[in-house]
């Protein structure tokens, strides 16, 4: 037997926490047990006779494993199995790349007047048929409307697609969900009535750019110059209709103090309504320290301002939880078992013009296109798409082999590696940052 390479131990006030990032198991150790584990690290088999109960707990939790276990290969296989999950499909549709707001941080190129054509709508509906036909193990079908501002084309695109989606999936043993990422300004009662009639679990993501005038100045619109209060009211209206809402708050070092003030807007909601809020604070990428490559990380330091901003975000997360809200930081710590929805093999993003993409966090242009939607509803993917998804992370990100977070990080994002084309680390190669991530994982684990 041997100790797992993915064991992490750290002290706390009353003792030590032992956590394994592969099995996601944790143990509380007093000082005596922590010392015993350290002393017997290289001869762990001897511990079975000295302290059999402790040894059994270590084996049961995956802290001690058989000598022939290749843990790195096990993580690679776990990641591949997650991405190849045949029981779910994630289909994203961009009805338009036009938008009724002008946000300074937006990475997309607005295409004024763009709209999915009737023929592309028909091809998209045929794609839904194709997905249902070719995926006999399908148990969860997730449909997303993105953009641009998708509600600009509610009648022209969303209604016919969603109506067809509802009709084609009704009566099947499939969990169906719809999520609409919107700026929220165009929501009205007629739309909400339509979504309820579809009989499909529907959720919204609505974004704020600060509190009050900070939001209004950042989110420019001639039609909606005072959009902050409009969005607050629309979120509350959705909650009253028993619809879940992801309240995403984009913040910078200048307005991080707004986070809690925005949450306070929902204190007057009833407890059941607050339970339907998923709070997601996101630091705007132009404001954050985004260095992830080794070369870049060697040339930066995390300054005091960054630490203060992070602390304010963490404080707001705790406050949201105290109000009974759900909390979902934008970067899932465990992206192996819970990958980005666009990383799955069974995932596609259909642009208004029929171009097909994987990642929705990059511009929808020719350089990033991964395929084309054909008229019969099938997708003609680039030949190397699956080889890039399934490529072993340790083949090109060699630092992952020695990293305690590999079982939860999985070597990072395919798109990010494509952007940098060199070794990188989501935690900036910083061991303290990695340990903090472990502590967050432990906080999510029942001790």
For every predicted segment, state its role.
Residues 3-28, 52-92, 136:
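N-terminal [4Fe-4S]-dependent radical SAM core
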Residues 73-193, 198-202:
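Conserved alpha-helical substructure of the radical SAM core
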Residues 1-54, 374, 395-447:
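Radical SAM enzyme core and accessory elements
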Residues 213, 217-232, 236-343, 353:
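Radical SAM enzyme [4Fe-4S]-AdoMet core and its adjacent flexible, acidic
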Residues 21, 350-351:
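Short, acidic, Ser/Thr-enriched surface-loop or helix-capping motifs
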